[in-house]
Swiss-Prot record:
GO terms for cellular component: carboxysome. This is Ribulose bisphosphate carboxylase large chain. It comes from Parasynechococcus marenigrum (strain WH8102). It is an enzyme of class 4 (lyase). It catalyses: 2 (2R)-3-phosphoglycerate + 2 H(+) = D-ribulose 1,5-bisphosphate + CO2 + H2O; D-ribulose 1,5-bisphosphate + O2 = 2-phosphoglycolate + (2R)-3-phosphoglycerate + 2 H(+). Binds 1 Mg(2+) ion per subunit.
Amino acid sequence: MSKKYDAGVKEYRDTYWTPDYVPLDTDLLACFKCTGQEGVPKEEVAAAVAAESSTGTWSTVWSELLTDLDFYKGRCYRIEDVPGDKESFYAFIAYPLDLFEEGSITNVLTSLVGNVFGFKALRHLRLEDIRFPMAFIKSCYGPPNGIQVERDRMNKYGRPLLGCTIKPKLGLSGKNYGRVVYECLRGGLDFTKDDENINSQPFQRWQNRFEFVAEAIKLSEQETGERKGHYLNVTANTPEEMYERAEFAKELGMPIIMHDFITGGFTANTGLSKWCRKNGMLLHIHRAMHAVIDRHPKHGIHFRVLAKCLRLSGGDQLHTGTVVGKLEGDRQTTLGYIDQLRESFVPEDRSRGNFFDQDWGSMPGVFAVASGGIHVWHMPALVAIFGDDSVLQFGGGTHGHPWGSAAGAAANRVALEACVKARNAGREIEKESRDILMEAGKHSPELAIALETWKEIKFEFDTVDKLDVQN
């Protein structure tokens, strides 16, 4: 045995804490928020994360001599305090790109958020951000279509797109489900949507739903002269079943399908995205289960990481929360990961939670979807926050209209167009929101009733997961 080999256990920081290291452009960089066990030095905790998420194990092993460990190991190169948190700290780790399979988000996450999250030396661990190098981005397929192609295909420009989730989301027969879709689309919406948990249940098998939805879309297109769509959820118990459903949607002439990317998994999502690109279909992505992973401020994976991974894995639309609705998410954090979905370059900006510069090159962008507890009074804020390259989805805010879903859809369409017109005229639509909506309501009885119905409805709860920024 080589004389270089010394059996036994040594501290992680002897090998994986490298404060003099300067990251390479080709390195994959990660920022972890670490909370170690009492008495364990920060450097040892951070080095343990670097080791266990790359080449390390608990003991020195002879087979290290068979490879170039210094080339392949992850390196913790910086530690920072977390503002306002004396228990936790940020560990910045650089990983050589050769540790990861090209184009595989599954492989990246298996390393970075694998066994290390169960490590006893850690009380909590959270993956806050990843900087993907351009060499890795170029190996990923990304969105099957992107923002501009979707606009061209749907022939919709100059404003956010408008949609809603069909309610009740479970329990309707296929025919009644199609009836609700028709009412919404003829009322003025661009899209309707399956909810995340409707697949193929006894009360409504997927073929039946797809057929009645297709009929509803064709009728509404004939009546309105506009291109319409419905997110047909093809998420299934096996990939083979998922592709069968996608093929049937294509046969029916539908423009868009849907996938629950976290419960379905990144491998399934990447495969479906490739299928959509090949077959000319748009792909809507729901983030069901995300809050289990991202809501705890000290443990899990931040949603900005999931959003980045989804852009690389592939999707044309992704749910991002609303800021003003019923779901978790403050304004600056939400804007931070919306930038990661849509922009070609996003600079480091701690005020938005972005720990690294991120160059996306020529990869197409993803529509940000605002959905969850929103109604017409929220429209000015939504237009201001999300901008044009977004989908604003009003579920209860459509179906809960006293005159029915068609009237709710009409109210939302009038409110949206009034806000876009006011914005284009240079008005501050958030400050002047009441005047803008009340004026539009004078010419739309549907909007006037909606404004009266939801005038007292607010979701004013403090955000659980807040940005760690210095005051």
